[in-house]
Amino acid sequence: GACLAILAFSGLFMYDENGQLVPDLAESYEMTEDGLSYTFTMKDGLKWSDGTELNAKDVEYSWQRLANPDTGADYAYLTTVIATKDDGTLDIEASEDGKTFSVNLVAPCAYFLDLCAFPAFYPVPQASVEGADGYADNPGAWCTEAGFVSSGPMVCTGWKHNESMTYE
């Protein structure tokens, strides 16, 4: 799963060929002195594979979706390092212009940037996710066939279930 996800999707950070953590969708980030808050600045010109803009609002949507119990996400527990608001949602926010993304943590977390490179934290396209037939009953319905909207270096162009996937 994750090996294929990194072909089709990108995160705020990634690991380079030397295993070093480097910005991917993020251009830069700032962390407060106490290690409790991060602000990421997104790169300009980011696009989904369908040509629509990818920005910090997509990251916010995706992280809230990951933490939402209704999605049944296997890795939702990883979001417990992030503070929550009174309504139970994650204490994260994209700027109105979609250029920056802010995160507040419950405590300093030495591996937080590593989480930003983990596939569960990769942004997903809200319009595709919520526009998929069967979305209400199957939160993963949007990406069950070749051609799903993605953000990574490759696009899934062929999918023979339980047999093979083709990426170009």
Task: Map each language-model feature to its residues.
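A structural "hinge/loop" feature
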Residues: 1-2, 25-26, 52, 112-123
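N-terminal lobe/hinge region of extracytoplasmic solute-binding protein
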Residues: 1-33, 149
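Extracytoplasmic "Venus flytrap"
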Residues: 1-4, 46, 162
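Extracytoplasmic/secreted envelope proteins and their assembly/folding machinery
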Residues: 5-9, 22, 26, 56-63, ...
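Sec-exported extracytoplasmic/periplasmic mature domains
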Residues: 13, 17, 47, 64-71, ...
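Aromatic- and charge-enriched surface segment that lines or borders ligand/interaction sites
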Residues: 28-73, 102-104
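Surface-exposed binding/hinge segments that line
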Residues: 41, 60, 76-131, 158-160
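Gly/Pro-rich hinge or "lid" segments in bacterial periplasmic/extracellular proteins
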Residues: 117-168
